[in-house]
Amino acid sequence: DSDDAEEDAEPPLVAPLKKRQIIRRKSANGKGAREHREAQAELPVFEPGSYEFPPLNLLAKPQARARVVSDDALEQNARMLENVLADFGVKGEIQNVRPGPVVTLYELEPAAGVKSSRIIGLSDDIARSMSAVAARVAVVPGRNAIGIELPNHDREMVYLRELLGAEEYEGTRGDLTLALGKSIGGEPVFADLARMPH
């Protein structure tokens, strides 16, 4: 009977797991002879307030802008942009124009009932109609306005000297202040590297 019981027993549905060998790589925690030789013996520490920054005259002076966009040209572009939007069935009025070093921001206040997604979807058509490489369209947070950024024909060079010489830089309290450039409105932009996630 025991032979019949063995024949009637069904084979297991799951094959037994085979024990695999796990090979971990060795961590490179040990220092080699070269690393010991080149290790810094000590860190020179300056007394607080004893370090002086290099003078600003080591950096190039900002050149006078050869071409400044006139208020008339900005007004004409704003009217042209309103006409382009009207051609696509978008009613609204441009309230503010903010020329920056690289792009100019046109703030459009859409008429009642105009969806912002409709205007945002027209960004490629706006760029083509305004003879621009690209147009960036986004809602201005906290206001009933849509920002339309169009690139300037002549980009303004931003010099490190004018950023480091700005009053805003002197007023920063960061330990590692970085000069990033200028905002769309032409104001200097700084950030504290010590406060950034890392």
Which residues does each predicted region cover?
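Low-complexity, intrinsically disordered P/S/T-rich segments
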Residues: 1-198
